[in-house]
């Protein structure tokens, strides 16, 4: 845990930086007690009180009242002179909140909590993915990719659970870590904590007696400028643009927002629908060549100053496009693990269908799957997808309610369900004929099987490049790692 700072030097803040933060807090929030200032700034009151005493002597702050014993219960407010000084501080930046953590300390704690320290065993991955129908050989590919803490490419036709797999990987890794609310970069504030991506866990406390001075202040076991959160999972899709990979500067508040790859440090970063972004895949990978190899990214302040930040996440690309149509082999080698997510076999399809029926309290019959294969997959040339069982059963339940019937797997209900789901295109196949919708992240049974992988054949025939061999290949079978 990040230790509680005992001195101002321990915080990494200069005396004037803390003074400015106290003044801005009083300016924005109005009169506050010492305890309320501590709750906002998140450093021990004793350190804040040293600055309050100085501000009182300089006639910037005055005491308006008291609640309880000790200065922690005093109510502090700005004087007229103090408001002028606070406005000067606001001109620098308008950040009010937990005191920023120095960039060096942030780097230190990213390294201490690195995703490289997370590993999964065969038994652990079987338990973690027990809610999915997966070929055991597929787990042999997935496990090493997770343990690498590098980059992973999940590709295959839509509807086979790539997005679900990526999110399941993140959930399976579990754990928690400490993320600073904000980081100080040469006097500039970069806000890092994001409630969208960082799920707070309860704050810990240390048992023990309290002195009269800090009786109002809860005793915490760690530096409260850090938030204790679940391992972050940052998800982005087709809306991604190149400028989102850089610092987002608000010219009004003069505060920076960290880009999403920084918010993902210590966790999982998922780029869904890779190749469908408004930015070209080549441009995106060009932007990340150095971070992928060096595990370090470089961001730029609006002043032009560049600074390094850790790039420490398991990066997962997911796409239903042909990888060789997106980027050339040289770029694919930069992504360490390439894992093909194929359509389910009929046996896997039956297992998925059975699980969906159980979850909907419907009696399962193998004959129902045989009927769908004969009347739709076979007749229309539509390839089965892992999301189909869930969607077909949902349609069947909807149709049963419409005709005032119990949802059972009988021909006329299956016909009504499938007719409104699959596109009746005799020359079908492909994405349109499949009638596929996006796999729900909480769906019970997306699945994969060990079918042939087209990229494996294409890569095996590709001419050798000047770059070193890909550190790992996980296509069409168990991973063959050549990682040193």
Describe the residue ranges of each PLM region.
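Conserved ASCE/P-loop NTPase catalytic core
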Residues: 130-317
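Short amphipathic alpha-helical interaction segments
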Residues: 42-57
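Dynamic helix-loop-helix/coil hinge segments at AAA+ ATPase domain boundaries and subdomain interfaces
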Residues: 111-139, 362, 379-380
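Short acidic, hydrophobic short linear motifs in intrinsically disordered regions
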Residues: 28-40
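A short helix-turn-beta junction within AAA+ P-loop NTPase domains corresponding to the substrate/partner-engaging
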Residues: 327-342
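C-terminal engagement/docking regions of AAA+ P-loop ATPases
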Residues: 410-484
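Conserved AAA+ ATPase small/helical "lid" subdomain
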Residues: 353-415
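Interdomain "pre-motor" coupling segment immediately N-terminal to P-loop NTPase/helicase cores
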Residues: 53-118
